[in-house]
Amino acid sequence: MENKKMSLWKQSKPYLAGLQFALLIAFIATIVSNIIIVYGPTRIKEMTNILASGLETSVDVAAVAAIGGFLAVIYVIGFLSNYLQAFLFTTAIQRFSERLRTAIADKINRLPLRYFDGHSQGDTLSRVTNDVDTAAQSLNQSLGTVLSSSLLVVAVLVTMFGMNWILALVTVVSTLVGFAFVSVFMGKSQGFFKSQQQDLAAVNGYVEEMYSGHNVVTSYNAIESTKEEFAKLNHRLYDSIWKSQFISGVMMPIMVFIGNFSYALVIIVGAALALNGQISIGIIVAFMAYVRIFSQPLSQIAQGITSLQQASAAMGRVFEFLGEEEMEDESHKERQLSDMKGQVVFDRVSFGYTPDRTIIHDFSATAHAGQKVAIVGPTGAGKTTIVNLLMKFYEIDKGSIRIDDVDTKEMKRSEVHDAFSMVLQDTWLFEGTIRDNLIYNQKDISDERVIEASKAVGIHHFIMTLPDGYDTVLDDTVTLSVGQKQLLTIARALLKDAPLLILDEATSSVDTRTEELIQKAMDRLMEGRTSFVIAHRLSTIRNADLILVMKDGNIIEQGNHEELMEQAGFYADLYNSQFTEGEAEE
């Protein structure tokens, strides 16, 4: 446990940079506050003794008033110290959590796609939001309290033993017996809190998956099975939360009982000592205050440790994410593309998503500048994988991919990405204006170019029917068809105006009329660009200069449409299966 805590501390240090001074001031304010809390009962003892001795003669009102005024002043100072401590701790912890979120956002951009292949979106989102929030809230509620209470316990112990060791021993022994009992619970709670965070991530991930696929779930009448699976995950979450929260909730009642038990013992033993003339009434009154002061911070420490363990579990998941293997550092790579012609060569490329399963086998092909290259094949043939490798979303295992004779291994990923415009089957639009979506991350794009690209893909008329035209904000109130979303993403790719173009099943999700509209626009705008097209509808790639037919990660046929049809092989069978004999002859 100590090694783990030390590891978490070391991992946290970079995110605490610049906050040390604020934490130091908060620590000093905590010390001042605790000194005042401990010192107060000693003056109350003096006041009690003055009042007790004055019962036989006369009460020294001036002395009592002086002590009362002094106590009022120092308690105001104690209040201000507590306020300062809370303010500084809260500020530092929230700044710490802000930096963690920033680090996670940056980390996501540095993670390879392999990571997301093996982790659900819900689990990743849970680490970004739930785990960071849990850590911040738990630290905010407990860090200052545990520190303050620990210092207070030490100060009270020193003061009590200095005043009367017998009553001090009674207080300490009775309290520590109960505290030892509590520590048994503490040892088991860490695992429960970790399970709670993991089960919460599982529920979030499942809900996100079912929400995004709601139409599919409904169409397959899988609602009942979905509810059953959710019930299992939800019950598991209930079980882990119940265990962690039960242990958390039982701490305070136990510590209150311990405090009351110690309080009663001090009164009984103190009364016996007073009757024997060993202590004054003032000492008993002071110890009655110290018992409360001593047991209360122990209760707070117990609660605080529970919260810190919850924070530790959450931070462990956050730092586990931040420690994931990143993409290769490419700062040393300086090869760039200039005056691009657009020739792309795959030279004996092999790749597998896992070391034990190769997807692409010794893949070789050449796309000459300006050619339209189509990649076809059945599902699982490796078509999309080829595009992922071309874009350097994954690093190839063997062979090379060269753009204008420059090996992409020698280029930064950003340099490769700049060379391509890309349209995916799954459209991505963010909440913002249509104009912002079209010129996404591109500079110096004029309104004229935006309109020209929109007209080229046939979406301009629809945009102008919207109340705010290109300034219409895309959110839940704006309903777009699949085809309209696809046209917007194609217009975005056209505006990028990159020399290389990738269309990954860009027309597979639209109706025939929209497909024809897109195809005409793309045929016209692909002129002069090297284009890679992946499509299940083979009618869209009959005019391709080169068709690569893939099966099980291998190129089994290649040529143009007429050549492949003459071969009467796999491509011809695939083509004829999609069209009637009359259409095929055409």
Labelled PLM ranges:
Residues 23-81, 161-166, 277-281:
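Transmembrane helix-loop-helix hairpins at lipid-water interfaces of multipass membrane proteins
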Residues 17-18, 113-114, 132-139, 143, ...:
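An intracellular "coupling" helix at the cytosolic face of ABC transporter transmembrane type-1 domains
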